[in-house]
Amino acid sequence: MNTSDLKQEFTEAFDTKPERVFFSPGRINLIGEHTDYNGGHVFPCAITIGTYGVYAPRTDTTVRMYSANIPDAGIVTFDVNDLSYDKAAGWTNYPKGMMDEIAKTGVKFDHGFDFYVHGNMPDGAGLSSSASIELLTGIMLNTGFNLGISQLDLVKIGQKCENNYVGVNSGIMDQFAVGMGKKDQAILLDTNTMDYSYAPVKLGNNVIVIMNTNKRRELADSKYNERRSECEEALRRLQTKLDIKSLGDLTNDQFDEAAYLINDETLIKRARHAVFENQRAIRATKALADDDLTTFGELVTASHVSLHFDYEVTGKELDTLAETAWKQPGVLGARMTGAGFGGCGIAIVDKDQVDAFKENVGKVYRDTIGYDADFYIAEIADGPKEL
């Protein structure tokens, strides 16, 4: 999307002149899934598909928002002095929640604005459209109101918006991946300490293919909160004998020795995924740094197997994509990415095999599921910026 088209769309929506244009990426997670709320490591990166926003200040205290992706919602209007949650406000609760969380830090919004949003992420694909719009709003407010909030603080405000305002008990990964993204680099983040480092994603002759199930998933309505509470209960039982703060504190061997304390087969499976996936994320980062792409791919695949058997968040659509991908020539590894229950998977595929990969996996998916999957090459992007 180019800025002149976006500005034209803004003018058509609001019948006024736009002032600034911003972009905020989506994200994929290479490995380390459902570990961010268990004190583990994640290894995500921002991607070049995401959300564009066009902004113009107003002289009154009215805020008007319009999304090209949800035209039926029309122009949603509220006042800067009333930032209370309103279910009927739909998608605008994400930017409104960011305003509310920023206002709690003592910021006073002294004027309103018009905000036009246009995303090019597939709908419901699990590429973090909510974190993308939160951090888009963050950079827009930070710039438009000259707030001087650090990018890391905007990331934390984004998570608060999701948890406290929207009501989804998510970890920090999505906002961190979107907000702190760097071109061609993934981020190894320790969610226990918030220590992070950047790692170049050097895949040789391979590319990351995003595989979209085209099965919608709503994070708030999924079993996400259930899995989180299962892990919290498993941790509580382990803490009766172990001095640990999170499941991410344990090695695989330590977990195996102590698993009897959990005394519930389902809870053991959930916790085992969190512990083993954390170790996989650490090992995968090292493998990538060592140019050991075979090991990296094997760990990516092992992640999906664990998410299927132990965490049970994959479902037929994601399993069909991953399991079919594993059988294709030139594939190093494949897995679901994101919360699961639909959304997207990723595969590490030899560039020269991508066309055959899309055709073969696409055919099996269509024959098995009854509708098409979509495939895109992921390009790793910078975090939010003004265009």
Curated annotation (Swiss-Prot):
Binding-site positions, substrate: 33-36, 224
Localization in the cell: Cytoplasm
Pfam families documented for this protein: GalKase_gal_bdg, GHMP_kinases_C, GHMP_kinases_N
Catalysed reactions listed for this entry: alpha-D-galactose + ATP = alpha-D-galactose 1-phosphate + ADP + H(+)
Site (described: Transition state stabilizer): 27
Annotated binding of Mg(2+), by residue: 130, 162
GO terms classed as biological process: galactose metabolic process
Active site location: 174
E.C. no: 2.7.1.6
Example of a GO cellular component annotation carried by this entry: cytosol
GO molecular function, one term: magnesium ion binding
Pathway field: Carbohydrate metabolism; galactose metabolism
Chief place of localization: cytoplasm
EC top class named in words: transferase
Keyword check for Kinase: yes
Residues noted as binding ATP in the record, renumbered to the chain: 67, 124-130
Keywords: ATP-binding, Carbohydrate metabolism, Cytoplasm, Galactose metabolism, Kinase, Magnesium, Metal-binding, Nucleotide-binding, Transferase
Domain of life: Bacteria
Family in the record: Belongs to the GHMP kinase family. GalK subfamily.
Protein function: Catalyzes the transfer of the gamma-phosphate of ATP to D-galactose to form alpha-D-galactose-1-phosphate (Gal-1-P).
NCBIfam families the record matches: gal_kin (TIGR00131), PRK05322.1 (NF003705)
Stored HAMAP family: Galactokinase
Protein name: Galactokinase
Gene: galK
